[in-house]
Amino acid sequence: MARHPLVDQLRFTRKEFMRAIRGVSAEDAVKRILPMNSLSWNVGHLAWQEQRYFLHFGQGTTLYPDIAKEFAYGAPGTTPSLDRVVKAWKDITKAADPWLEELTSEVLGTRAVSRGKEIAYTHGNLLQRVIYHYWYHTGENMAIRQNLGHSSLPEFVGNLDDAAPYRPDR
């Protein structure tokens, strides 16, 4: 079975998100330029969203309860270690991947379940929310880097045409 095209878009988006923070020092990752969050908080926040949408809603599991508390929507901005949140992000995305690989258009059209009850969103809506959310925070992270005086920043959107070109789902 071929991977769903939205999963290809997510994989590309994840790579671009991580490309945007490549080379950032531990010191710069925790700096806050108000009202923005720190770059490291943004990484933890996307780890939270992937864990919630793809592990909790998709598979009924949570790898990092602390991530679920510290980086949830509306949680206060903090300055966590970049190493800590990147490790959690890698673990969470790795755990999500097998489930994502099996997604079909039919599954994407079904409502997600939390605590035994359907929620308002389909798995497809949640997948799109994650993709778009990544791009929002990729832009925010680039703005943080510009404000910190970083130069030679990556240009976006990378190699989309080769890495994640449009293709129909069937």
Please describe what each predicted stretch is:
Residues 22-29, 105-108:
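Short, flexible helix-adjacent loops and helix caps
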Residues 74-114, 121-136:
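Acidic/histidine-rich alpha-helical segments that form the ligand environment
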Residues 8-12, 103-106:
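An acidic intrinsically disordered interaction segment
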Residues 10, 14, 21, 89, ...:
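Hydrophobic alpha-helical core bundles mediating ligand binding, dimerization, or RNAP-core interactions
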